[in-house]
């Protein structure tokens, strides 16, 4: 039977299929709109299944705030080109809004959420895989709740490649967003240094000192003084005994320099503060509150917030593709393979 342009247009609007796919489906189903739509869905699932073993490591983060609930999600695509596709961008936005509204507990519950079109989120992702032409993956999400006295800091960087939600108490949304900007830039992994495992601290400290050794090897070649190792890496290692020993050492230095004892109390606090900064480098790398605030690096994030009567409660930071092993592609080999398949 003859298929009209109006029928093709209607089917495309309903399914998102391409012109030729829509026309073929209508021809195969004798113009039955519902049957054609079902046929396209079936073909879409089949196409999506073929793409299931591809690595999807590009994509976007999405953020949605719904009153005292916020959601952060990461959807992946295979290429950065598709990540900028309007349909993909809209899908990420819709997914974040659904998560904030439904507050699912895990990925299984999230994928079972009904979308505005009546299908589940999982089905919508399958359809998107078919129509966009790349594997679309729902990777991870978090739902964060706050009280009326707290504020969300929602921030996305680099077009959504990094997404951050923070919860700040005793501040306003502007300050909360600034903290999230800091988190996006400095990539802390925990809120407080108290959350860092002692073995982790030891391993990271060893890695830092190894890097110093490498730097010193280069410095020697150009007659620069060698940098000292960090003896400690976290405030958890700075016991009362360690701090007392450091203070005693500084007192000996001041005495040897001939500094009058009556002015020591003015000098020692600065030396002790520097000692703590120099020996909490692991904390500063991984713990938000211990990091120097990027908008005022004379203070840690914790000290800056305290100066504003505020307190950081929680945060989550997603960076697209982190932890996903990307396949190495050989463009020339792909071209030859494509030629062979012609």
UniProtKB/Swiss-Prot annotation:
Disulfide bonds: none annotated. Pfam families: EF_TS. It comes from the Bacteria. Its main location: cytoplasm. Transmembrane segments: none annotated. One of its GO terms (molecular function) is translation elongation factor activity. Residues 79-82 are annotated as: Involved in Mg(2+) ion dislocation from EF-Tu. GO terms for cellular component: cytoplasm. SUPFAM superfamilies: Elongation factor Ts (EF-Ts), dimerisation domain (SSF54713), UBA-like (SSF46934). This is Elongation factor Ts.
């Amino acid at each position: 039977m003859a298929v009209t342009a109006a029928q093709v247009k209607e089917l495309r609007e309903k399914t998102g299929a391409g012109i030729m796919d829509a026309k073929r489906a209508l021809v195969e189903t004798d113009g039955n709109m519902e049957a054609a739509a079902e046929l396209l869905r079936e073909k879409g699932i089949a196409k999506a299944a073929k793409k299931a073993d591809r690595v999807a490591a590009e994509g976007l983060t999405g953020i949605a705030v719904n009153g005292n609930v916020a959601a952060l999600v990461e959807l992946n695509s295979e290429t950065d080109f598709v990540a900028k596709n309007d349909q993909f961008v809209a899908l990420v936005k819709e997914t974040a809004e659904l998560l904030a509204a439904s507050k699912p507990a895990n990925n299984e519950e999230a994928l079972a959420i009904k979308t505005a079109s009546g299908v589940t989120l999982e089905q919508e992702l399958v359809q998107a895989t078919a129509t966009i032409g790349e594997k679309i993956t729902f990777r991870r999400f978090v739902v964060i709740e706050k009280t009326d006295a707290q504020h969300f800091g929602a921030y996305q960087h680099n077009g959504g490649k990094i997404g951050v939600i923070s919860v700040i108490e005793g501040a306003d949304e502007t300050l909360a967003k600034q903290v999230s900007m800091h988190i996006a830039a400095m990539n802390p992994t925990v809120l407080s240094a108290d959350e860092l495992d002692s073995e982790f601290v030891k391993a990271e400290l060893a890695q830092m000192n190894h890097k110093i050794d490498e730097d010193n090897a280069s410095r020697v070649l150009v007659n620069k003084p060698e940098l000292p190792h960090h003896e400690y890496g976290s405030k958890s290692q700075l016991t009362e005994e360690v701090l007392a020993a450091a203070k005693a050492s500084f007192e000996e230095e001041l005495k040897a320099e001939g500094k009058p004892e009556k002015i020591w109390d003015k000098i020692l606090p600065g030396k002790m503060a520097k000692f703590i900064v120099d020996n909490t480098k692991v904390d500063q790398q991984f713990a938000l509150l211990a990091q120097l605030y990027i908008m005022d690096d004379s203070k840690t994030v914790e000290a800056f917030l305290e100066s504003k009567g505020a307190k950081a409660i929680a945060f989550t930071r997603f960076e697209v593709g982190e932890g996903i092993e990307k396949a190495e592609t050989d463009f020339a080999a792909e071209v030859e393979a494509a030629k062979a398949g012609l």
